[in-house]
């Protein structure tokens, strides 16, 4: 965040982004990307690259897990049925949908999951943990299997 010069954004001091939703990659996801790209330290990554990658994970406003409409994948399609399309702070688009599992074969009472699909990479990403409240928004933590740059 510091390398990208985005401290004000994460503190709610940027116009239009006073409240944000951050689809947050794990440290492992970032480290995996760095190794794949040949970087040994964050300071080696160009500032513009850091900025783009982080902005791809941010949308304006607070979007709690329960605000995301139910949806479902459609085989061979990037965007399935339902859900919601978001535009990131970088301008890229991704589709997010929720899915509620059954509990002992009873519908609509099981756990609720979030999934994200990038229109750029056509990658589906599982959200590991939702609704992590921050001072100016909410974080939905992406699964460890996510590699930074796939969103």
Q: Each predicted region: which residue ranges?
A:
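Mature, structured domains of secreted/extracytosolic soluble proteins
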Residues: 1-151
């Amino acid at each position: 965040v510091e390398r990208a010069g985005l401290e004000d954004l994460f503190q709610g001091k940027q116009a239009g982004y006073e409240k944000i939703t951050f689809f947050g990659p794990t440290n492992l996801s970032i480290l995996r990307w760095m190794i794949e790209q040949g970087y040994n330290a964050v300071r080696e990554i160009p500032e513009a690259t850091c900025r783009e990658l982080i902005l791809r994970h941010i949308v304006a406003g607070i979007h709690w897990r329960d605000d995301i409409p139910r949806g479902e994948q459609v085989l061979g399609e990037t965007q399935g049925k339902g859900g919601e399309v978001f535009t990131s702070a970088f301008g890229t688009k991704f589709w997010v949908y929720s899915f509620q599992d059954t509990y002992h074969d009873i519908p609509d009472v099981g756990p609720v999951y979030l999934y994200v699909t990038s229109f750029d990479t056509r990658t589906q990403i599982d959200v590991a943990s939702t609704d992590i409240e921050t001072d100016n928004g909410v974080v939905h933590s992406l699964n460890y299997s996510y590699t930074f740059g796939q969103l």
